Structure formats: structure tokens, C-alpha cells
């Protein structure tokens, strides 16, 4: 009798759990750890906010720049907190903070996905955030400043720009991640570039996307990053897998993928456009311009790639 009562209780609990999962899932889905894994979202730090870099539609003025430091010319890189540097140009204000940035070029320039160069031309010029400095002396022809926050070594010639405080990104509690969510019709774009010109991306890394405040994007918004199999089909390297044989000797009617001529198929043709798009992670917006946004990857199911799609996530 006790065993019967225990089994009945377990059945009721199991039924209730499945019912609760079904109620919290979109129509046509069953929430499981496979297609709805829990995501723990990383919260951006002060360094993440001020060291992310950005892409700007127009070139920043370069009339104010770093000229050197206490040990110039013996020392050409300045990065220690409290280190003094000299700022060339005019209109520095004593006690004012400034932002040191660098206009970038990729020494190994090549397209990592079709159309990347054209998108970058529309987005503008990439810049690296190097440091926040505060002016402590303006009596000479050059201002003297000390480094308050260092992101990367400063070099002579790096640009000195105006500084603006950034609001912290609020903590986001853990939630369920829908791996196979179809398009929600919200604003979307692509990951076009990444900090340090990286191409294989994971949690904590910074990315630059081709949509901004003109599309209603604001700091603190979240994007769902996704990848379709059509992207692999059109990639000269990844597409090689689609051209390999998919047949197995015991299959009476083996299928082919996109009419692969290497597979003698009497079976069905699998069209990659019909495969579900897969979500690969979440990105939070750290900064925006009218046409671009800087984001930080806060959750990744797998490596993100340049060219991956992004879509505003209303969650």
C-alpha cells in the first residue's frame, strides 16, 4: 500500500512538472535542458564598459594626441595606473578626464565572410579604447595627465578625445535559452567585426554590429546571436563538408544535401534552408552610435563567428 501511494505521488509530481514546462514554453515546444538550457548571463564590469572599443561613422579629430611621457624617448608605451603622460594640442581643462583611443587598421586584412568589407565601409572606422586619463597640469605648451584606467598600452600619436560617463549595465538573472527560436521580427543585423580583429568569439569578448540608435537600439539591450546553415553553405571552407559523401553502405536510399553530386542518391534531397536556425548566444549592448553598436558576449552555447546574425531579444 505504501509503495502504491509513493508511485501515485511521483506520477502526480511528474505530471505537474511537465504541465508547468509546457505552460512556460512557446506553442509547439517542450521545454527541456536540451532545447531550453539555463543561461547564466555575465554582468559587464567597469573595464568592459570603458575598454570595449567602437566603430564610428566619421573619423574622430586628431588635433589632440599623446606626445610622450616622463621617460620619452626611452619609453614609448604607457600603461601603469598613475603614470604621467604629455598631451599635445589645445583646450585641455585642469582636473578634466579624457579618453585615449586609437584609430585602427587590420594588418592581416581579409574578408572573413562574404560582404564584410562592404558592411565595414558603411559602418565606419574602428577604434580601440586605451585609457582614461585626468589632466593635472596645463602650465606648459603641453598638458600633463595621469592614467586613471588602463585598457592597453598608450603610444605617442594616440588620439585624446572627450570623456563621458557610462551607466552600469544592470544584473540580469539566469533564464532559459531557446536554442531554436524562429525570428521574432525585431531589429536585426550581423556581427561584422570584433575587438582585436578576432574571428572566433566567446563569453566576455566584444563585438561590433551594423545597427544602432537609428534602429532604436540602446545601451542595455540584449541581442540573440544565431546562425543558419545557409551561412556555412556559402562559406568557401565550411561548405566543403556539404560536398563530402553522406552515404553509408547499408542505406538503401541515401539522402543528399543540396543535390550533392558526390553522393549517388536515390533518396531525399535535404535543403539547408529548411533546417532550424540555431541560437548560439546572447550579447548585451555596451555603446551605440547612430549606425553601429558595441556589444559584449554574455552567454555562449558555442563559438560565435563574424557574420553571425543578431536579433533584438525582448527578454
Language model features with spans:
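Bacterial N-terminal signal peptides
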Residues: 7-15
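Surface-exposed, polar/charged interaction patches used for macromolecular assembly or partner binding
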Residues: 2-5, 18-315
Amino acid at each position: 500500500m505504501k509503495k502504491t501511494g509513493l508511485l501515485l505521488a511521483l506520477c502526480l509530481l511528474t505530471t505537474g512538472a511537465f504541465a508547468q514546462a509546457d505552460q512556460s514554453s512557446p506553442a509547439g515546444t517542450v521545454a527541456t535542458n536540451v532545447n531550453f538550457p539555463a543561461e547564466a548571463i555575465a554582468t559587464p564590469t567597469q573595464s568592459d564598459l570603458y575598454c570595449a572599443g567602437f566603430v564610428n561613422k566619421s573619423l574622430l579629430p586628431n588635433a589632440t594626441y599623446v606626445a610622450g611621457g616622463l621617460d620619452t624617448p626611452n619609453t614609448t608605451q604607457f600603461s601603469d595606473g598613475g603614470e604621467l603622460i604629455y598631451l599635445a594640442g589645445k583646450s585641455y581643462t585642469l582636473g578634466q578626464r579624457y579618453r585615449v583611443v586609437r584609430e585602427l587598421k587590420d594588418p592581416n586584412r581579409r574578408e572573413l565572410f562574404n560582404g564584410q568589407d562592404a558592411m565595414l565601409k558603411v559602418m565606419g572606422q574602428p577604434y580601440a579604447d586605451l585609457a582614461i586619463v585626468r589632466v593635472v597640469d596645463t602650465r606648459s605648451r603641453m598638458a600633463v595627465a595621469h592614467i586613471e584606467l588602463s585598457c592597453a598600452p598608450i603610444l605617442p600619436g594616440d588620439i585624446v578625445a572627450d570623456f563621458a560617463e557610462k551607466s552600469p549595465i544592470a544584473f540580469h538573472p539566469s533564464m532559459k535559452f531557446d536554442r531554436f527560436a524562429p525570428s521574432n521580427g525585431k531589429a536585426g543585423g550581423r556581427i561584422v567585426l570584433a575587438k582585436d580583429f578576432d574571428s572566433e568569439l566567446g563569453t566576455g569578448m566584444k563585438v561590433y554590429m551594423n545597427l544602432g540608435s537609428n534602429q532604436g537600439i540602446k545601451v542595455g539591450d540584449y541581442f540573440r546571436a544565431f546562425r543558419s546553415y545557409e551561412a556555412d553553405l556559402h562559406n568557401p571552407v565550411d561548405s566543403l563538408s556539404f560536398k563530402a559523401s553522406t552515404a553509408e553502405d547499408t542505406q538503401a536510399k541515401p539522402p543528399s544535401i543540396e543535390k550533392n553530386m558526390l553522393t549517388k542518391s536515390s533518396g531525399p534531397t535535404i535543403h539547408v534552408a529548411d533546417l532550424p536556425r540555431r541560437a548560439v548566444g546572447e550579447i548585451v549592448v555596451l555603446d551605440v552610435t547612430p549606425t553601429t553598436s558595441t556589444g559584449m558576449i554574455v552567454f555562449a552555447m558555442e563559438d560565435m563567428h563574424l557574420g553571425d546574425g543578431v536579433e533584438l531579444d525582448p527578454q
